[in-house]
Curated annotation (Swiss-Prot):
Residues 26-38 form a propeptide. This is Albumin-8. Transmembrane segments: none annotated. One of its GO terms (molecular function) is nutrient reservoir activity. It comes from Helianthus annuus. SMART domains: AAI.
Amino acid sequence: MARFSIVFAAAGVLLLVAMAPVSEASTTTIITTIIEENPYGRGRTESGCYQQMEEAEMLNHCGMYLMKNLGERSQVSPRMREEDHKQLCCMQLKNLDEKCMCPAIMMMLNEPMWIRMRDQVMSMAHNLPIECNLMSQPCQM
């Protein structure tokens, strides 16, 4: 009987030694960092600019100001003067991060309604931040 006890004890020790690596389960945590490249310098990325642009009502007054400059009066609020739209446009642009002004204007011009007028309006649009005294250089579009 003592012999069986020694055999069982030895088997138990071997079993514990064999299971030791299994019971020492290690946990590996992988941390992934995504660095989003921002082509517009510091501040928010283009998607952040789009969010700001949405908050600025898609620069609707800038669009109306540009349309009035083109003589597109039928599509624009007849009650507001061109100068009123310009002032409101400047307020909308001022609410954007400086790095988002030009990308937001470009996003506005990528809207379907601007496709047929894009060439005509491009030169006026890239000067909007200058007209509003918000930047010293025109937007590079």
